[in-house]
Regions:
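Outer-pore turret/helix-boundary of cation channels
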Residues: 52-80
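Canonical alpha-helical transmembrane segment with a positive-inside/aromatic-interface signature
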Residues: 120-185
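Pore domain of cation channels
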Residues: 69-134
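Acidic, serine/threonine- and proline-rich intrinsically disordered appendage/tail regions
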Residues: 242-290
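Cytosolic juxtamembrane amphipathic/interface segments immediately preceding
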Residues: 20-43
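Short, non-transmembrane cytosolic segments of multipass membrane proteins
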Residues: 1-17
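Alpha-helical transmembrane segments of multipass membrane proteins
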Residues: 49-57, 61, 113, 117, ...
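Extended, solvent-exposed segments with strong compositional bias
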Residues: 185-226, 239-245
Length: 290
């Protein structure tokens, strides 16, 4: 019976989900593992592979005592450093294989070493070239009257100094509901936004959903949302103007992240010189309505 995993995932909102019973296939999905592991663990992993690889071939060279000429330092560590030089194709000219067995081992090491280094280089390039979105989301969402109707408002900002072209936003409500048969299921509702597209997303973006009688949030309160295990998922996507790559970001909001009868602090001001200024130090600030 294959071994299974038990792993806890922490969502952007802080919500934790623990998964059990999935087959353990970490070694069959190394590409995804190395794309998602932290940089320190990645370098430690590559360093450990490099050390173990050369230890293995040093042990193979040790099977024949006179396989390497001018071995220095003598013994196992001399063979280890010869393996390092062979893997890197340095060719200092002092130590070299002098028997058929040593030549065969060195040839096999060069072949496997080139393949391994090519894979490592490709993985590093994939990590560096992977598009990342530097999108700042407000810590809280607010609900306030706007144009006579309660409106859910969220705020996002582009942390980079370049433009995200054709930015699109989608807001969804996830909550537990009961069917007419009494079966409890989790449903996802789309929450229409007043403006879900931005042709050029450079500074900030306030996203608004009007809680009309037809809205899935109509009549909702903090208590009902908690009872239904509800949360909001906001996703943003667009094209980086500099690289032409598609960017994606998401944020989740739990019921305790919603602030009723509050509004976002104004971060835009105009100085006496006529220049408009955006103060991102107040980006997360909210204010109660009078």
């Amino acid at each position: 019976m294959p071994s299974t995993t038990s792993k806890t995932h922490t969502q952007p909102s802080g919500r934790q989900i623990q998964r059990h019973g999935l087959p353990r296939r970490r070694w069959q999905d190394l590409y995804h593992v190395y794309m998602t592991v932290s940089w320190p663990r990645l370098f430690v992993s590559f360093g450990g592979f490099f050390f173990a690889f050369n230890l293995l071939f040093a042990a193979l060279y040790s099977l024949q005592a006179n396989g390497i000429a001018q071995l220095n330092p003598p013994g196992f560590w001399g063979r280890f450093f010869f393996s390092v030089e062979t893997l890197a194709t340095v060719g200092y000219g002092d130590m070299h294989p002098q028997t058929l067995f040593a030549h065969i081992v060195a040839s096999f090491e060069i072949f496997t070493g080139m393949m391994s280094l090519a894979l490592i280089a490709g993985m590093m390039f994939a990590r560096f070239s992977r598009p990342t979105a530097r999108i700042l989301f407000a810590r809280h969402a607010v609900i306030r009257p706007l144009d006579g109707r309660p409106t859910l408002m969220l705020r996002a900002a582009n942390e980079r100094h370049n433009v995200i072209m054709e930015a699109q936003a989608h807001l969804r409500l996830v909550r537990d509901e009961r069917t007419i048969e009494g079966y409890r299921i989790r449903r996802i509702h789309d929450l229409p936004l007043r403006r879900s597209e931005q042709p050029a997303f450079l500074y900030g973006w306030t996203l608004m959903h009007t809680m009309t009688p037809d809205s899935p949030l109509a009549g909702a309160t903090s208590e009902t949302l908690r009872t239904d295990n509800a949360f909001l998922i906001l996703t943003l996507s667009g094209v980086d103007e500099t690289t032409g790559q598609t960017l994606m970001a998401r944020q989740e909001y739990l019921p305790e992240d919603l602030r009723w009868q509050h509004t976002f602090a104004d971060i835009l001001s105009r100085g006496e010189d006529g220049i408009e200024r955006i103060d991102y130090r107040r980006f997360h600030d909210i204010e109660p309505l009078n």
